[in-house]
């Protein structure tokens, strides 16, 4: 997976994510929408109870891993199913393309989430930190991306 973005004054203005395994190119430009292989994409309108939750967790921080699984279990009780893929950029694109309804990870570097976060927003989704606060792209952050504000 390859992910790239362009920031202007702390705001992502262009985001691109390429999945070579499925030959999918996701991209978005602020104010212009989100696309996959040239087709416009949108988040799903499924409620969480009928939806899929995606999450990530770092294998390098066992305390963070424990908190991630506790949160995953809490979301699993509300959702239809849950998955962990290992790629923040692709998980964010899955939200944008309507393949899942919610994604979270407790600590990511900006290069892991910046491009995908714009793609989600331009597809109609919402991206914040885990506490619902705006993302600061200059530093590591938690991520909560969803198909709509809950």
Locations of the language-model features?
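Acidic beta-strand-loop-alpha-helix segment within the catalytic core
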Residues: 5-92, 133-135, 139-150
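Hydrophobic residues within well-ordered alpha-helices
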Residues: 93-96, 114-122
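Short glycine/proline-rich, acidic loop/turn segments that cap or connect secondary-structure elements
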Residues: 122-125, 132
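Short beta-strand and adjacent tight-turn residues that come in two discontinuous sequence segments
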Residues: 105, 130
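Conserved small/polar residues in nucleotide/adenosyl-binding loops
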Residues: 1-3
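Alpha-to-beta junction loops
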Residues: 97-102, 125-126
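Acidic donor-binding loop at a coil-to-helix junction in glycosyltransferase catalytic cores
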Residues: 111
